[in-house]
């Protein structure tokens, strides 16, 4: 079906694509570079004693050496936050709970990858997750609900960036805690980027799905109930934003995008998503799950035109 090959998408990094950027965004980028320089000096200072033969007992955890931390801006506090959490909710720093990866600079602003991975041994089950791109016309990328079979959350997808922006993840745990992490990404023009395929072809193939069982053992390890496994779900859909023009004209394409997605296995929920057009064209989700021995995985999606897309994928049953 011509889908992108599976891999660790978070390695993508290249030059900034040609697109409109406001002076405010350039100012943000310059501020970020200053912060990066200060961070580099701080890390260097901490490592000097060890290099000079002094004590090396103190080492920064990997996630303390962030290359693209969020930058200050009014949009989250003044506009977006109220749509994500209640005013009285205390947002805790989530760096100890989850690892969140997004590129410093994206090669393609229409397909910016991100990965959310729960840190091992935290003892907290994440039940909900909201992904936000602060400066997008539709900032809330998606609201996810996770079933117990998702275990320690490990999920990847791709999003659009309209201008340079923070991307942040807010998660809720089973015990009632709310945590947030975020990164700043240099990418712009993704919400108005040209549709990659012929419109007639895009509409004709809309709703087609593919599920990859990511068995990295090459089939050498048989399935077993209780095992942690990985899969990649790919769905054909143009995810029209309403900001894209028909090729060769100034006529805008009407918005149309997937707004709900539900994945189940043997009748048990893996994850459910309510989303918007900030998700990239032809959505792709790589996720880990706990095998419950079921022989099938079901996917159901709906879009803003009321279309329903459903498919059942056979699985090798667990032992």
Regions found by a protein language model. Name each.
Residues 202-228:
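Surface beta-strand/loop "capping" patches
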Residues 5, 16, 27, 51-52, ...:
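Intrinsically disordered, low-complexity segments enriched in small/polar residues
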């Amino acid at each position: 079906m011509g889908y992108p090959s599976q891999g660790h998408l978070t390695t993508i990094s290249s030059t900034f694509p040609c697109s409109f950027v406001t002076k405010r965004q350039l100012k943000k980028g310059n501020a970020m570079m200053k912060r990066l320089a200060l961070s580099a000096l701080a890390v260097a200072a901490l490592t000097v004693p060890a290099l000079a033969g002094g004590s090396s007992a103190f080492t920064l955890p990997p996630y303390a050496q962030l290359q693209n931390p969020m930058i200050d801006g009014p949009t989250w506090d003044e506009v977006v936050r109220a749509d994500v959490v209640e005013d009285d909710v205390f947002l805790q720093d989530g760096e100890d709970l989850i690892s969140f990866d997004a590129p410093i600079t994206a090669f393609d602003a229409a397909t910016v990858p991100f990965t959310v991975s729960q840190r091992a041994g935290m003892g907290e089950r994440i039940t909900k997750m909201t992904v936000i791109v602060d400066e997008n016309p539709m900032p809330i990328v998606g609201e996810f609900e996770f079933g117990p079979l998702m275990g320690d959350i490990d999920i990847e997808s791709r999003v659009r960036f309209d201008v340079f922006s923070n991307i942040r993840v807010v998660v809720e745990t089973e015990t009632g805690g709310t945590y947030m992490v975020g990164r700043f990404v240099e990418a712009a023009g993704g919400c108005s980027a040209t549709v990659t395929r012929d419109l007639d072809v895009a509409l004709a193939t809309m709703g087609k799905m593919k599920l990859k069982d990511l068995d990295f053992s090459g089939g050498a390890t048989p399935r077993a109930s209780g095992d942690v496994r990985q899969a990649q779900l790919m769905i054909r859909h143009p995810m029209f934003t309403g900001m894209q023009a028909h090729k060769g004209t100034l006529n805008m394409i009407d918005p149309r995008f997937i707004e709900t997605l539900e994945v189940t296995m043997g009748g048990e929920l893996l994850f459910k998503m309510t989303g918007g057009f900030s998700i990239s064209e032809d959505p792709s989700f790589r996720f880990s799950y706990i095998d419950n021995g079921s022989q099938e995985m079901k996917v159901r999606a709906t879009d803003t035109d009321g279309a329903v897309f459903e498919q059942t994928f056979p699985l090798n049953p667990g032992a």
